[in-house]
Amino acid sequence: VEPHFLFNTLASIDHLIEVDPKRASVMQKNLIALLRASMPTMREAGDGGPRDLGRELSVIRPYLEILKVRMEERLDTAIHVPEGLLSAEFPQMMVQTLVENAVKHGLEPKPEGGRLEVKAEIVHGKLAVSVSDTGLGFGKAATAGTGVGLANIRERLQLLYGTKGTLTIAENPAGGTIATIAVPYKPLQGDNA
C-alpha cells in the first residue's frame, strides 16, 4: 500500500466524517479490508513469487471501492474472473501495480473519469490477466510516470518465468489502455494458497 494513497484515504475519511458520515464509513471499512488483505503479503518472505489470483483480487477489490468513494461517479469498475481461476498461480502485487497505473495515469487526470476492468482468462494455455481503462490513453496522461512499476513487472516476470511470462501494453479500442500479464497456467500447489 503506497503511503501517499494511505494518507489521502485517511484525509478523505476525516473530511467525510464531517460532511457524509455514511460514505466515510464505507471508505473506512474498505481501507480495513485492504489492509487486512495486503498485510499478510507484506509480512511474508517478500520473494515476489507466485500466490493465487484470488488473493491478489482480495487486495484489489477494497482498493477499487475506496477509489470509487473518492472519485464518486467518475469511476466505474468491474472484475471478470471465473471462479475456477481464483486458485491459479499468479505473481503477487502485479495486478495491483497495473490497477494503480490505470487510475493514476489514465482515469484520475481525466475530468469525467472512466471505467476500469480486471479480466482473467486462459489463452493458449496461459493465464492472461488484463487491466483495461477508458482513461486518457497513450501520450495524454497529465502525470508522466517513471515507468518503474512496469519495468519491475517485466523484470520479475523474466526471473519467474523466463520468456513464458509477458507484459503487453496496448491501446484500448474503447479509449485508454489495456495492460495484460500472461503467465503459464497452473493451479497453486501446497500451502501457499
Regions found by a protein language model. Name each.
Residues V1-A170, A174-I178:
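Two-component histidine phosphotransfer core
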Residues G176-K186:
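Short C-terminal beta-strand
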Residues Y185-A193:
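Hydrophobic alpha-helices of bacterial signal-transduction systems
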